[in-house]
A protein has these predicted regions:
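Conserved nucleotide-cofactor-binding alpha/beta core module
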Residues: 81-82
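As written
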Residues: 91-92
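Active-site pocket-lining/capping segments in soluble small-molecule metabolic enzymes
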Residues: 1-78, 96-97, 104-247, 254-264
């Protein structure tokens, strides 16, 4: 609540630390009506910056609170140095770059935008999709939906094959009825979490691509079809520092204080 936020800002400043308040929603019209009124008490608490993504809200905040520093959120999906220059001209003080960039792309942005503060995620979950940027078409067909070449992979038919892990770690399909209806469905029970984990593996196969399998793992909690591996860039921190990245970001939203502290 607002009291906790004010206390947190005062606590951080008393210990010589900065605190940035995330306000990175992409609002519908209805939320614009009260946005500035709702944000005024937050701004008056004196955070060191607002993390924002929507161009309209950024414009409104800069008009109403011209002295409030603004950092561009990762949710603005900044992918290239031209976009960074655009936001720099708009008065943004720091850009949190898209998590989908390679190290070489980050280095090029740093080279092209030497005067802009850059922040990079080095740990946390990765989103599966953004409107017009679904990963399926790019993963299966190497055709990027955002480049106008989406193959609508989400609408294709997929069969599920049970698999086992070989001695060398390879996944081997199990000879059995491969229709999706034949796969045992996970049903939660009152003893969920008790007993040995199932550790099952299923391979998804698109009907026009026989023999091309995509793994989906199941344990005692369920099946994780949409669960990407977390970003873990600790091995690249030294290079990021050398190229001049100003800040490294660890995902904290929906995570415990313990998780964030131990990761840091």
């Amino acid at each position: 609540n607002m009291d906790n936020l004010a206390e947190g800002i005062d606590f951080a400043h008393a210990h010589g630390k900065k605190i940035f308040v995330a306000s990175n929603i992409m609002p519908h019209n209805s939320k614009l009506k009260t946005y500035l009124k709702d944000m005024r008490p937050v701004v008056e608490m004196g955070p060191d910056a607002l993390i924002m993504s929507d161009p309209g809200l950024i414009m409104m905040v800069k008009d109403e609170f011209p002295d409030m520093p603004i950092h561009l959120s990762v949710q603005a999906n900044t992918m290239n140095w031209a976009s960074v220059k655009f936001w720099q001209r708009a008065g943004i003080e720091r850009v949190i770059l898209s998590r989908e960039l390679s190290l070489d792309e980050v280095a090029e942005i740093r080279q092209q935008c030497p005067d802009m503060e850059l922040e990079v995620f080095v740990h946390g979950s990765l989103c599966i999709a953004y409107s017009g940027r679904c990963l399926l078409s790019g993963y299966i067909n190497k055709r990027d939906p955002n480049q106008g070449t989406c193959t609508n992979s989400c609408r294709w038919k997929y069969d599920a094959h049970e698999a086992k892990e070989g001695d060398n770690g390879d996944l081997i399909p199990v000879a059995r009825d491969s229709s999706a209806d034949a796969v045992e469905q996970f049903e939660p029970t009152t003893d969920l979490g008790l007993g040995d984990p199932t550790d099952k593996v299923y391979l998804l196969q698109e009907e026009t691509r026989p023999g091309e399998y995509m793994p989906a793992y199941e344990d005692e909690h369920g099946t994780y079809i949409m669960n990407s591996k977390d970003l873990r860039a600790i091995q690249h921190v030294h290079r990021l520092a050398e190229m001049g990245v100003d800040s490294l970001k660890i995902e904290g939203r929906t995570k415990s204080h313990y998780y964030a502290a131990r990761t840091a």
